[in-house]
Every structure is written in C-alpha cells, then in structure tokens.
C-alpha cells in the first residue's frame, strides 16, 4: 500500500507547486508539500458512481457544476479533492486552471493511507476556507459521513451506511441510494 509523504524541509507555495514536473500528485497545506498516492480502482469506481448521480441532480435542477481532480486554491494552499460542487451563483471562482476559493461541497473518498489526513488537515482547511458541506466516503466501512458548517467547526448532519439513502442539506431533494454507490 502506498503511503502519504509529507515534505517539511521548507515552506512550499503555490508557485513551487506549479514548478513540479513529475507524474506524482501533490497538495500543499500549511506550507507542507504532501505527496498523495494515486487512487485505487475501487476508489475511482465509487467516485464515478457519485458523479453519475450528482451530475444528474445538478443538470436537472440547474444547480451548479461538478469538478473532479481539480486544483482548489485557498490562498497559497492547494488541494485536489476527489469531487467538488460549485453552486451556480458562485461559478465565478472557477478559473481556467483551478478553482480559486471554497467549493460549496467537497467529497473525499477515504483510503487507508489518506484517511487521517482527510479527516484532520483537509477537514480543517475546508472549514477555515468556507466550504459549506463536506462528505467523507469510507469504502471499507461502506458509509458516508455528511458534515455541515457549524458556528466554530463542522457539525455532522448524518452518517449513512450502504443500506440507507443519503440526503444533503445543501442540495434539496437529492437522494442517493448508497447500495448503488458501494455495490461490488
């Protein structure tokens, strides 16, 4: 299993990030350069199924746009969430090469090597940056935790297992049958 590597030899910036020219995936949080392992097939299958459902919802409701594997900038910090949604009234944050500011919804599919990072550092960055809703999808436990912004931190709005239907406070009327997302 690949692991997450954090480089702390100096403070990294988005300018440094743009100069990286190998095939690895990187993120920068708090000036630290993080080498993120590539997603595995099961991870990608779950993301693909979520995209299908969410794209249908967004198109039908003309609610916004969905982006995958895109650089999201919070100042000099850059991350590439598995999936983000920008609601239609905030599409101005979408630039030619990145998203400059907080998406409305961020979805991270956990892997053993990134779970702690997604739950702590990225979660804190998303909250501080202004993300409205954050989903943590756990393929091994077959559940999704949905968090919404509280006054000082995230509030868990729901925890849904593979036998349940996920509801999103941010996307009225959205219902996701998780058995369809987690099926083998």
Please provide the spans of the model-predicted regions.
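Gly/Pro/Ser/Thr-rich low-complexity, intrinsically disordered segments predominantly at protein N-termini
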Residues: 1-184
């Amino acid at each position: 299993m690949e692991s997450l590597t954090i480089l702390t030899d100096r403070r990294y910036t988005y300018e440094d990030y743009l100069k990286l020219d190998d095939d690895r995936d990187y993120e920068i949080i708090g000036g630290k350069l993080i080498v993120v392992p590539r997603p595995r097939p099961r991870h990608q299958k779950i993301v693909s199924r979520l995209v299908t459902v969410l794209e249908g919802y967004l198109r039908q409701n003309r609610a916004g746009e969905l982006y995958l594997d895109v650089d999201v900038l919070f100042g000099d910090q850059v991350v590439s969430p598995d999936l983000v949604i920008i609601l239609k009234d905030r599409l101005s944050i979408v630039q030619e090469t990145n998203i400059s500011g907080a998406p409305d919804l961020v979805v991270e599919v956990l892997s053993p090597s990134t779970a702690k990072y997604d739950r702590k550092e990225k979660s804190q960055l998303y909250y501080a940056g202004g993300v409205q809703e954050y989903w943590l999808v756990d393929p091994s436990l077959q559940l999704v935790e949905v968090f919404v912004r509280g006054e000082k931190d995230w509030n868990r709005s729901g925890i849904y297992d593979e036998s349940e239907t996920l509801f999103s406070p941010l996307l009225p009327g959205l219902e996701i049958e998780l058995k369809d997302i987690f099926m083998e």
